[in-house]
Structure formats: structure tokens, C-alpha cells
Regions:
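N-terminal, positively charged, Ser/Thr/Ala/Gly-biased leader segments
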Residues: 1-16
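Short, low-complexity Ser/Thr-rich regulatory SLiMs
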Residues: 12, 51-52, 106-108
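Generic N-terminal amphipathic, Lys/Arg-enriched alpha-helix
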Residues: 14-24
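Short beta-strand-to-turn element immediately C-terminal to the catalytic PLP-Schiff-base lysine
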Residues: 23-26, 50-51
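Anion-binding (especially nucleotide phosphate/pyrophosphate-binding) glycine-rich loop
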Residues: 34-68
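Acidic, low-complexity central loop/insert segments
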Residues: 56, 62-116
Length: 116
């Protein structure tokens, strides 16, 4: 099994600053236990896992111990990977999460999260 893992330092312009999060794009969901094991191995506060559903992105967050309902910096990190690495075309990214729909807009090289 292979997948890409990105580490993003949210709220920072330089490496080793800001709030780190790992971002893992998936084609299909892995078991909750495997997602948790990956998050533990990453050893950062939160790991974001996502699946691109076309009209929205299904997004889940895990700490090294549990799945959590909401994580702002890991959502922004995911948006950053979608736009800058995976070349997601829309300026607004809709995320489907345990906390409902979240939107991140990319404008003037900034990511703006509509936080509930």
C-alpha cells in the first residue's frame, strides 16, 4: 500500500515554524484503525485524510489518539496541498466533515477558512 503524505506548517512562511499538520490524499477510505496508526506514525498534533468526491472534498482529522470533529489548521493545510500541489482548479474548496460543510477560499495567495 502506497500513498503520499505531506507535512504543512500552517500559519508560517518558513519551515519549522507555525502549526504542523500532515495531509494524506486517499482514493478510498482506509479502516479507522489504519488511519489512527498512520496519524500516530506521523507524530504531529493532527493528520488530515481526504478523498476528492468531485463536488466536494471528504475530510477527516486524526490526532495520534483519536478522530476529532474539527481542526482549522489541518483544514487550511489540506487546502494548501489541494491548490499548490494537486492543482485543484476552484477558488473555493468545499469540505464535508463531521462538523458539517467547511469552505476555504484561495485569494491573493492566501487561504481563508469560513470557520463555524
Amino acid at each position: 500500500m502506497k500513498f503520499q503524505i505531506y507535512q504543512v506548517d500552517a500559519f508560517a512562511e518558513n519551515v519549522f515554524e507555525g502549526n504542523p499538520a500532515c495531509v494524506v490524499p486517499l482514493k478510498k477510505w482506509l479502516s479507522d484503525n489504519l488511519l489512527l496508526q498512520i496519524a500516530k506514525e506521523n507524530a504531529v498534533a493532527e493528520t488530515a485524510f481526504f478523498i476528492d468526491e468531485g463536488d466536494c472534498i471528504n475530510l477527516r482529522w486524526f490526532t495520534p489518539d483519536i478522530e476529532i470533529d474539527l481542526c482549522g489548521h489541518a483544514t487550511l493545510a489540506t487546502a494548501c496541498i489541494l491548490k499548490r500541489v494537486l492543482k485543484y482548479s476552484s477558488e473555493t474548496i468545499k469540505f464535508r466533515t463531521l462538523s458539517g460543510e467547511l469552505k476555504v477560499t484561495y485569494s491573493n495567495d492566501l487561504f481563508l477558512l469560513d470557520f463555524p
